[in-house]
Amino acid sequence: MLDAKYFREELDQTAKKLATRGFDLDVAKLQKLEEQRKEVQVRTEQLQAERNSRSKAIGKAKASGEDIQPLLDAVSDLGEQLDNAKEELKVIQQELNDIIMGVPNLPADEVPEGADEDENQEVLTWGKPKSFDFEVKDHVDLGEALAKGMDFETAAKLTGARFVVMRGGIARMHRALTQFMLDLHTDEHGYLETYVPYMVNQDSLYGTGQLPKFGKDLFHIEGESQDQIPMSLIPTAEVPLTNLYRDEIADEEELPLKFTAHTPCFRSEAGSHGRDTRGLIRQHQFDKVELVWLVKPEQSMDALEQLTGHAETVLQKLELPYRKVLLCTGDMGFGAAKTYDLEVWLPAQEAYREISSCSNMQDFQARRMQARFRRKGAKKPELMHTLNGSGLAVGRALVAVLENYQQEDGSIVVPEVLRPYMGGVEVLKA
């Protein structure tokens, strides 16, 4: 969440910046609540001071033999007024907090203004889309033809729409992609591989910003035990990885911290009805290799370039054409200050499709989580900056490999970097 100073000292300017994201901040309501908060805060402090003064007077009156009952009655009355004022202040602060928790991050100064994805800026393209001298098939037709290596019909019987069963060479390639990504990020990019829970509590989801605003996008767990804490399946490993330092204070020397994890991700895809209903592009369950950085504030913009570069390296080693896009203000995610999307070329769609989103959240998540660090010699800790990105979405990487490496007979050439993970197999055939 944003620093309270933006709502107390820079409200109009903050509202203008948020408007570039398509977010309408209710300035009048915030101003009214802030005025009420100040008035009740002053009244609370005055009542506390008066009560303390009367309490001291009781001791003096008692020592001099005076009747202290009137003073006792006055202190009791002041105590009741003070309790009421504190409760009123608590209600106002909670209402302010509820509003602030629903406000997105402010865009960084270099982020282009725009309403939607049509106004994103292409930064670069890498590789040249391959020309095929035969009719290109999409990943669904290719996967189903390879000994039913990709089976959506059976998955629908087992669970429902937007799930898949993979078999044989397709399943092995999916696993190979995961292993290749993890090895690359740990061996060459310096990430610490981390195994995390696939279920998280509400504090974790508040910390990274999924709650309270995006609860409908999650799958929530219903347990039989009455004392079970509310939990949800993770929508991304960003949630548990970033929350590793919730309510923690790191030493300056520990930063930057770089974590990677391979997990399944679970999303309800609320609001995406009718979009990408065919194939692996938009599933309720999908695998992803996540990259998370925790850094000092002055490091975060450079860290974003590095993190994005690490995701790009995966695509380059797979020799998959892609483009890098700087998102405009209106297309960024809730907690992001700056985001790059990597979009891989899919021949069957004749289009670039998102395969990674890399974001600098600055101190937006850290403030919610109270994830802090202490500089050497400093007394007070500071908020970290957090970053995250896909390195990559495994299912979409599989889609890209199948479509870009297809041959006329429906077989798939295995990218060279994946062959060591597939027992030396060079071609997937039916």
From Swiss-Prot:
UniProt-listed GO biological process terms: selenocysteine biosynthetic process; seryl-tRNA aminoacylation
Swiss-Prot/TrEMBL catalytic activity: tRNA(Ser) + L-serine + ATP = L-seryl-tRNA(Ser) + AMP + diphosphate + H(+); tRNA(Sec) + L-serine + ATP = L-seryl-tRNA(Sec) + AMP + diphosphate + H(+)
EC number assigned by the record: 6.1.1.11
GO molecular function: ATP binding; serine-tRNA ligase activity
Location(s), subcellular: Cytoplasm
Pfam families named among the record's database cross-references: Seryl_tRNA_N, tRNA-synt_2b
Pathway: Aminoacyl-tRNA biosynthesis; selenocysteinyl-tRNA(Sec) biosynthesis; L-seryl-tRNA(Sec) from L-serine and tRNA(Sec): step 1/1
Domain of life where this protein originates: Bacteria
Leading EC class: ligase
Ligand binding (L-serine): T236, A237, E238, E290, S390
Keywords associated with the record: Aminoacyl-tRNA synthetase, ATP-binding, Cytoplasm, Ligase, Nucleotide-binding, Protein biosynthesis
Residues spanning the membrane: none
Notes on the domains: Consists of two distinct domains, a catalytic core and a N-terminal extension that is involved in tRNA binding.
Similarity comment: family membership: Belongs to the class-II aminoacyl-tRNA synthetase family. Type-1 seryl-tRNA synthetase subfamily.
Annotated function: Catalyzes the attachment of serine to tRNA(Ser). Is also able to aminoacylate tRNA(Sec) with serine, to form the misacylated tRNA L-seryl-tRNA(Sec), which will be further converted into selenocysteinyl-tRNA(Sec).
PANTHER family hit by this protein: SERINE--TRNA LIGASE, SERYL-TRNA SYNTHETASE
Protein name in UniProt: Serine--tRNA ligase
